[in-house]
Each structure stands twice: as C-alpha cells, then as structure tokens.
Amino acid sequence: LLAGIPSDPSLYDPSANPHAAILRRRHVLDLMLKQGKITQRQYARADKAELPDPNDIRLPGTQGPAPYFVNYVKDDLVARYGAGRVFGGGLKVTTTIDMKLQLKARAAIESVLRNPDGPAAALVAIDPRDGAVKAMFGGRNFRRSQFNLAAQARRQPGSAFKPIVLATAMNEGISPVTELESKPVSIDAGDRIWKVTNYDHTYLGRVSLSRAIVSSDNSVYAQLTDIVGPKAIVKTAHSLGIRSHLSPYFSIGLGSGAVSTLDMARAYATIANDGRRVDGAVFENRARVVEKVERFRSSKVDVNSPLPRQVLDEGHAELLTDILEDVVRVGTGKRAAISGRQIAGKTGTTDNYGDAWFVGYTPELVVAVWVGYPDALKPMLTEFNGEPVAGGTLPAMIWKAFMERTDEDPSRSFDSPPYQGGASTWVVRREGTWQLDNGYCRGSRLVAYFSGEGPEDEADCKPNEVSVPLVVGMTRAGAEATLEAQPLEANVAYAPAKAGRIPGLVVGQDPRSGGLSAGDPVTIWVSKAEHGMLPNFVGSGIADVQREATRLKVRLVARTGPGRKGAVLRQDPKPGVAVGRGMRVTLLVGDGSRT
C-alpha cells in the first residue's frame, strides 16, 4: 500500500479514494509476485487485507490534548533551527501550554457547540503579562484534519477589529469623546464610492467614538477610518501583534482584513498589557509558545524570555480597556459577563454571518474565540436556536464557559485610565493631512484631541470656497461647463497634441484640486493638432492616399488582402487623431481577390 502511494498521493490516498488505493496496491503486489519477492500465498493474504482506518492512525503530536499547539511549536522550531535538528533529536523544548486550560478550552467549546455537523470553533488564550500562549484549540479532530483553525485559518474579524481603529485614532491624538454623526455615509475611496450603513439600519445621531464602539456602529467607524486612513490602521494592527497580511482598503476599518484567532488574541493581549506587546527573546515577534530550548549534551540553553515593547501609549491602552468594559456591561458582549469579574472585550460579526467572534480579557488572561464553518464561508443564519450566529451569541457563550472554568483571581482589576483632557477643534483635510480650519473651510470636522495633540498648521481655505473639480480628459466645452457650475472661471491655453492622440481634450489644469473662492480662475490646457489631423483613408485609392501622406509627412506601411484592388480597406491609427511628422500609418489595401 505505501509503495503505491508516492506516484500520486492524492489519487491513491486510502482514506479519500479507497478503491483506487486497492487497485494500486494490487498492481504493486503483481510486480512483487512476478519478481519473486513474495509467494502466491503472501499475495493472496495481502490482497485481502483491509485498508487502515484513518481514525486508528496515530500521527505525531496527536497523543496529547494539544496536537494543534504541538504542530505550531514544531513549525516555530523548524523555522529557527532547521528540520534536521528538530526531527533528528537532541532538543528538549519547554512550552508555555497550560494543559489544564487546554482541556478546559475543549470542554467549553463542546458544552456550547454540541452538533458535530454544525459550526466549528477556534480558541486561543494568552497571558497578557508575559505573552505566553496558555491554550490553543485548533479543531475537533487532528487525525482527520491537521489544518489549525486557530493559527492557520484567516477569517474576517468584523467589528472585533474596531478597537484597533480606535487605537489608531488615539495614536494620532484623537480622543474617544470625539462625536461623529451616525447615519448612512458615502466615502470617496479613490477608485470608488464606499457606501456604509449599520446592519440593522438603526442610527444614533451624533455619538462619541466610545459609545459607537459599544453599540458597534459601522457608520461612525467608517468615518473614523476615513479620518485616520487605512494605512495607519494596518500599521497599528501589525504593531499590536497581528502578523497576517492586511491590505490598506477603507473597509479594513470594519474588519474586512482576514486574520487568525491567534492574531486577534495577540493584538488584544497588547491592549490588556497597557500597550506593551510581549515578544520572545529568541523567536522575536511571534506568539510566545516556547519557554526554552535545551540541547542534548550541551550547556547552551535558548531562553525565550518575555521581551515587552511599548507599542501603544499606556494611558491610551487603559482608556481603551475602560471603553471595552462597557461592551460587556451594556453592549453587544453581555453574554460574556461573569458576576464579580472585570471583563473587557468586543464582538465581531461579518455581514453574511459567515464568521462570528468574541475577543475578551481579564487582567490575567486574554481569550479569542472564532465560530464558523471551516471548509466554506457558510452563513450561520439559524444555528443559534433558529437565529443567526453573531459575536454576542455562541462565541461569547464559549468565552464565558471557558473563563468560568479557570482559576483566576477575581479580585484583580484593571488599572484606571489617567485623565486626558483636551479640546474640540475644527479641522479639514488638505493635501493629504489634517489642518486647522481657518474659518473659511468647507467639509471640516469637529474633532476632540488630547491635550497637546492635533494639527498645528492652518489650512489656506478661501472665502466662499468651492472645490476645484478635475477636468483633465474632458473636451474643452465639457471642462468649461463643469468649472462654470462651481462657479469657477476657465482660462484656456493650448498645448501641442501628441501624435496619435485625439486633439481638443484637456491635458492639464492648474490647480488640479483643492479649493478656490467662487469665480476664481482655473487654467486649462487644451490639446491642439499643430500639424493637422489624420484624414479618413478608407475607401480612397492608394495613389491618392500616398499624395496626402507626403503632404502630411507621415510614413505609410501597407499590406494587402482580399478586397477591391487598390482601395484602402482599413487604417491604423483611426482618422481624427493628431498627426506627427514621421508618424507610422498602417493600411490594409485590397488586392482584387475575394474572401
């Protein structure tokens, strides 16, 4: 059986394709019999043997309660020391896993998700104080699938990502007391208009950033994403410990970037640890799963001691924790609440109910829980007692079931955030940065900044300011009409049209963007064919075309094809473009034959 598999492991996989595996085994046995390697009796016995049951196969790492964690540790070790040293023996590895918590993680998940055909779950628990991974549940059955749902699966976190957006805003000096209008919004995302609504079409009016995160308001956090910018959010996410690739699209502010459960646990652990991300001295910016590595017959020990790095202001982290406590007290995470325990956290649900999250923490433990179908993005519309699965349902229930099984000290509490006063200021985006409104700016926002924070430069807005539209690429008439509608005055200048381009279009303008006072001039450059325009040669005789080409000083390249003899059938470039001296014009000329 084993000898037949390597030629095509997928085709001859005995668990996936047992019939093909049996036929392949028989082929190998035939060869062995012909070569005298086995007797007829041995052949018959081997041919009748049952295929092994995959559930009876003991894979390396499956003997304990944490097989997915063991595999994750192996990957880290191979990346650091190489496969030869890791699998060749001689290393003694001490890990961070807490077997009691690992067993409790499985028990908590099984107590909530009782249907084997229903959604699956992933869970990661981290001690925020030293970054140690204490539990990692990556799937129900390691023998059937070695794919680690906790570390390898990448799924959208939805609103569980909003604390990272708020942390980004705090990094830029923006206070959570800043109020934005909760309403349907349309945001210019550059190549498209991003339209955002709240999932239940309920809007709160003017609301603070802190209250909006408790209510999981998409509209407000889409606007906040526009203020701080997607690139800054990606930078913050990576600094907090998320290692998955994130693209800086505007939708990232609502959790569209795919991340792992381990990613989310690390990011929240950084917040819970007063803004300090804990790396390992040996494995650096990776989840800390190894305590130390000892070598056989060597005194050298690689101690992967905690290495804290301040990546978020301590006061900002404490303020963020204070806000996230309200999510559990009065917001979408109420099912995670435990009497007498201080808990902070955030729910997350994707638009199609394909992913549901709860990431929460106490002063001693951060736990991230994901619920969904592992093999497909299947909407969970009825899996919660006939209702959709949101982050505040099954994930929050698993989180609570796990935390109630732990031996945490309930008397420990979060540090109170320091007072961070500030003032609200009108600001406007100009030239890619936020500047102070000089009193004439349109589209400005009222933003509350921490003391000593916020923009210092004043915008150069004009009285009765209007926006300068981009008219490059329009016809002269279209550009003049667009500018007049603002109202702005068009000053027309001309520029030579490039050979092969259509003349009469706007090829430049000054200014290209920004604001001007109503009636101010905008200079536009319209392309002009200085050497004439290419005529329509199709249908003309080749002799006439050659004379015109000589006059225009263009170079003809002719080839023949079926059609009226001596007549031009097709030309490239098409007529109406600007002529350039020496420009190549390709013609198809009829040779008198029929198609």
Pin down the residues of each PLM region:
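Glycine-rich, acidic and aromatic/proline-enriched surface loops and short helix-turn segments
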Residues: 1-8, 72-79, 126-140, 170-174, ...
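Short, well-structured active-site flanking segments
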Residues: 39-44, 144-147, 170-189, 228-232, ...
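A penicillin-recognizing enzyme superfamily signal
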Residues: 95-116, 123-127, 136, 142-147, ...
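Second-shell loop/turn segments in exported
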Residues: 9-19, 28-29, 33, 55-63, ...
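Soluble, non-transmembrane domains of envelope/secretory-pathway proteins that act on or interact
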Residues: 188, 297-302, 343-555, 559-561, ...
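Conserved catalytic neighborhood of penicillin-recognizing serine enzymes
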Residues: 57-65, 174-233, 249, 268, ...
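Short active-site loop at a secondary-structure junction
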Residues: 119-120, 144-164, 176-182, 251
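Non-catalytic, structured segments within soluble enzyme domains
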Residues: 1-103, 137, 235-239, 243-244, ...
